[in-house]
Amino acid sequence: MMCGAPSATQPATAETQHIADQVRSQLEEKENKKFPVFKAVSFKSQVVAGTNYFIKVHVGDEEFVHLRVFQSLPHENKPLTLSNYQTNKAKHDELTYF
């Protein structure tokens, strides 16, 4: 993977779900709602001064959200940050940089 270029979309892994779970409360607070389902479906990653994860998450019914989560470099010892998100996404919507 080139530094700065997002990876190809991949199926979500247990690690991806763990990352999504760690920022779930940040999203629920910003949206002022609790999601009955929060299942990571797919993701892309981008190496920067740390890693950006773009994660498609199923949040119930036919509703999806796209998350951009930043993970700092290991030596910085900082928590994951929900950098940005997009709501009202569908299952077929492609993960893109936002």
From Swiss-Prot:
GO biological process, one term: amyloid fibril formation
Record keywords: Acetylation, Cytoplasm, Nucleus, Protease inhibitor, Thiol protease inhibitor
Gene3D superfamilies per record: 3.10.450.10
Record flagged with keyword Iron: no
Subunit and interaction comment: Able to form dimers stabilized by noncovalent forces.
Organism name: Pan troglodytes
Top-level division of the source organism's lineage: Eukaryota
Role this protein plays: This is an intracellular thiol proteinase inhibitor. Tightly binding reversible inhibitor of cathepsins L, H and B.
The name this protein goes by in its record: Cystatin-B
Gene Ontology annotations for the cellular component aspect, listed alphabetically: cytosol; extracellular space; nucleolus
